[in-house]
Amino acid sequence: MMLRSAGGSIRRAITQRQNQHRFYRPGHGVFGHLPDPPKRVFENQGGLTPENAQRVHLINAFRRYGYLEADLDPLGLRKVESVAELDPAIYGLSLDENVKGNFSLHDLAEQLRHIYCGPTAIEFMHINNWEERQWISQNFENCIAEELRKEELLRIGDLMLKCENFDKFLSTKFPTLKRYGAEGAESMFAFFSELFEGAAEKQVEEIIIGIAHRGRLNLLTQLMDFPPVHMFRKIKGRAEFPESADAAGDVLSHLVSSFDYKGSEGNVHVTMLPNPSHLEAVNPVAMGKARARAWSMNKGDYSPDERSARAGDSVLNVLVHGDGAFTGQGVVWESIALSQAPHFRLGGTVHLVTNNQIAFTAESSVGRSSTHCTDIAKAFEYPVIHVNGDHPEEVVKATRLALAYRERFRKDVFINLVCFRRWGHNELDDPTFTSPVMYKEVEARESVPRLFLDRLVEEGFTTEEAVKEQLQKHTEQLNNELKKVDSTVPIDISHRGRWEGFKQAPKAIESWDTGVATDLLRFIGAGSVKVPEDFDTHKHLYKMHIDSRMQKMQTGEGIDWATAEAMAFGSILLEGNDVRISGQDVGRGTFCHRHAMMVDQSTDHIHIPLNELVEEQKNQLEVANNLLSEEAILGFEWGFSSENPRRLCIWEAQFGDFFNGAQIIIDTFLASAESKWLTSSGLTMLLPHGFDGAGPEHSSCRMERFLQLCDSREDQTPVDGENVNMRVANPTTSAQYFHLLRRQVVPNYRKPLIVVGPKILLRHPKAASTINEFGPGTTYQNVISEEHATSSQKIKKVIFVSGKHWINVEKARDERGLKDSVAIVRVEMLCPFPVVDLQAVLKKYPGAQDFVWSQEEPRNAGAWSFVRPRFENALGVRLKFAGRPELAWTATAIGEHHTKEAEEVINQTFA
């Protein structure tokens, strides 16, 4: 193995000055969350009078209930029932009475019905904020009256024509292709066209899009400059990546692109994210990516300008949903719940729900319990704009209103595009088996683009000849692209932008020098507990945390887990990298060990010492305590980590057992993203683990599941290299943990890291390290073996363990007087499997005849099933098992049983 230098000078980093201030100021909120502007107070502009009270009630009734009578269904299947509250008579009003001049109450009612019950409707009266309601009512009413210009109508018509033609082209050239086309929902491209144009006009610099399969290929080729030839290559079975790339690829409907949109009033960079087939899973990923982009740009919550900056400046997140998944998937609720949370807010996401009124074969009547698929938005007081998909021009208006609302209030806004699906879930599926009535209507009607273009022709905006000419030209372009398939090679789009200079991990194992000068570590350690003079610190923290750490820095002895972490964070910051740690209790730590943020006991103000190590510190630690969610949070953090490699992103579970609430994210992003999409991530998961008698859900991070997800070879031919899909480590000392964290940012490649984290080791003296174990020339040890007072040739038995179990095994061995004949080897890195390190250890014990794998976990859990074949195949060692018997869950909750099991594990180990 080659020892490599981290490169760069931390000393130089300390002296670097930042052009702009960007550090935490006491009393102004923590880094990553700007204080909210003061709420505006509105004076009463005049109350109701006896003369107008009932009319106002009628107006507000249309604003509140008008959407229930709106003309939203392009198929005409939805029965619109009369809403009693919209009848003027119940307010004691007569249609004949005059409102003003010749304007009668009948005229008022008709006007209200035209505005609030047409092909565009809105829900907003559930919002508590008076200013928002007033703004929406005024702007919506103006929006409905707006007329689009000729060039805007023609742009929409041309775009939808091309989208429809693209679907027809694919169906002709590739009749067995599942393309998940946009037919029936072509109005969604009026949304995207206006979104890009409007965002550029509002000085948005970056748009991050999360979208599933429906209409994705159309969006890529017709609006996002994705070369159709590359799509045709994929359809023909060719790889989307160069042969040199270490990747397996993904399905056609998960292709991605990014491009620069050049609008009439400005430009905006648009990025579509890769996604799995697990619908809505991309939502939090896109949110995390968007927020991370704001940090990289020093915008929004990360801006040094606290006076004028607002969350959402320069970066816009856009999520496109399907009606069935939007209603049914729990990650939707979790993600929206994050939308205004500190350290997660984006300043408003624009949501488009492509509501084709059916999910696979489930129609809306069985697909949800609510009136509309977007009703979830009302729980968070977000407005919903409903639009009939047969009216693309109304979609443009709705998009303008949504962008304006988001710009003004920096909150999420939803557009419910009610449309239909021309074919089945895919084009090879027959939907008439289960939805015959719906599909009679679908088959009997013209397409959305055709209806819209007929209107444009009828109104004199274009001619049928011009439409045919445009159609022919577009078909020729697609045919020309198809002809180039055999002569076109794929383009490597990985490691660009902020990832420039990074690469895929090598196939060999590397060892990097992750040590740091000890005088600097003492400086960081002391700085990590430094508080302002007027800060009212909790009395117990002085002795347990501050004084204790200062003593450790003076003696260089007994450095515990939290101190090692603080030194790792501080050194990473001073080397020019940012750090973000999120989780439900990460500021303090579930086990009250971290205290990265301290709370003033008099004012509740928060102080993060690591953000003030040096004056005008360039890089920052964001401590993100979050809501009780796993899937959305882990997805958010994965998206965050994929945006910038010079940022250590960590998610810590409250207990390791709770990770499986995020299993979809782990399976489809964390473990597989690089292989599928060449998307790298250095996300680190800290999963507290250990059998201490706490019972199920508080004992195991199920390391076996992560090991099963690793692409490590059982036969170890070749042996594992750095190119495994993720690293799984079970460190036993604070220094080991320190080196693990630093290794996540030192190399020029990134891999996810799963840390089987400790609980009792956090403060255990045997897990503590000396300052020299962190110094220059030190690195992570994949395997830790013992130094023996007598000859290692006398060793007859070798016990392999992983994690804190070694303390129990060592104690039992020494009590049995077996120290001279039994060796204990700690396997600290499970994946990549450390074959070379273990070979070196085994050579130390030529007389050993008995090899045991001892673990706390049941036989069907822990590392056993992973290490056993690798020991046999790569090392020629047949291991005996010592551990708990197979169990249907992780651990017993009966104290007596736990104690008895623990004794039995030790007895097996030394049998």
UniProtKB/Swiss-Prot annotation:
The entry's keywords = Glycolysis, Mitochondrion, Oxidoreductase, Thiamine pyrophosphate, Transit peptide
Gene Ontology cellular component list: mitochondrion
Required cofactor(s): thiamine diphosphate
Q: Where in the cell is it found?
A: Mitochondrion
* InterPro entries reported for this sequence: 2oxoglutarate_DH_E1, DH_E1, KGD_C_sf, ODO-1/KGD_C, THDP-binding, Transketolase-like_Pyr-bd
Q: Does the record bear Ribosomal protein in its keywords?
A: no
* Physiological role: 2-oxoadipate dehydrogenase (E1a) component of the 2-oxoadipate dehydrogenase complex (OADHC). Participates in the first step, rate limiting for the overall conversion of 2-oxoadipate (alpha-ketoadipate) to glutaryl-CoA and CO(2) catalyzed by the whole OADHC. Catalyzes the irreversible decarboxylation of 2-oxoadipate via the thiamine diphosphate (ThDP) cofactor and subsequent transfer of the decarboxylated acyl intermediate on an oxidized dihydrolipoyl group that is covalently amidated to the E2 enzyme (dihydrolipoyllysine-residue succinyltransferase or DLST).
The family this protein is said to belong to: Belongs to the alpha-ketoglutarate dehydrogenase family.
- What this protein is called in its record is Probable 2-oxoadipate dehydrogenase complex component E1 homolog
Q: Whose protein is this, by species?
A: Caenorhabditis elegans
The gene it comes from is ogdh-2
